[in-house]
């Protein structure tokens, strides 16, 4: 049995949605195009069952943004529904090309700014999506795994998941 046959016999967990954060919009568009092409051309037969709702689509990308206020603070905003979806969020925390203004001054986004935006989008999606998965090429704040002095363990402070709705990072 080929891998495609296994894939054809596997039921989707939920309708697929993809969020490409501003730091990796181009990559997110390429992933979206590949998934659209794959689902249109490779999978031969999709059942008319309610389990396959929105299986084939022209676009899996979710329109979202993290607008900034004049002070540099931001908020996560989802511009379409993600209720009941299998949500994948893509981000690149090492992208230093993005900028925003604080009190009229141009500021480059740091890895911490990208990570905060990721947490804002996760917060906006929590309780609505069936599953939330994060695709992040560089696991930010993971370098420190034990304490040697009075110092923080930043990654260990992240408790995002609810018992019934896991979030994979």
Regions found by a protein language model. Give the residues of each.
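Short hydrophobic beta-strand segments
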Residues: 11-22, 87-90
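Short N-terminal binding/cap micro-motifs at the start of the first secondary-structure element
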Residues: 24-31
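Active-site-flanking structural segment that lines cofactor/substrate pockets
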Residues: 48-98, 115-119
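Glycine-rich anion/phosphate-binding loops
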Residues: 62-72, 103-126, 148-157
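Active-site-proximal loop/turn and secondary-structure-junction residues that shape catalytic pockets
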Residues: 138-140
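Single conserved hydrophobic/aromatic residue that forms the stacking wall/gate
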Residues: 158-169
């Amino acid at each position: 049995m080929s891998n495609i046959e296994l894939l054809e016999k596997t039921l989707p967990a939920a309708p697929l949605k993809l969020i490409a954060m501003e730091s990796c919009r181009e990559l997110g568009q390429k992933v979206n195009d590949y998934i659209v092409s794959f689902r249109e051309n490779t999978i031969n037969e999709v059942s008319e069952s309610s389990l396959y709702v929105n299986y084939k689509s022209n676009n899996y990308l979710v329109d979202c943004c993290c607008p900034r206020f004049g002070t540099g603070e931001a908020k996560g905003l989802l511009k379409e529904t993600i209720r009941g979806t299998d949500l994948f969020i893509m981000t690149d925390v090492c992208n230093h090309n993005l900028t925003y203004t604080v009190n009229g001054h141009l500021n480059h986004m740091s890895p911490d700014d990208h990570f905060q935006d990721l947490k804002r989008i996760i917060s906006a999606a929590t309780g609505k999506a069936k599953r939330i998965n994060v695709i992040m090429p560089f696991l930010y704040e993971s370098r420190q795994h034990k304490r040697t002095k009075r110092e923080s363990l930043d990654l260990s402070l992240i408790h995002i998941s609810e018992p019934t709705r896991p979030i994979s990072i």
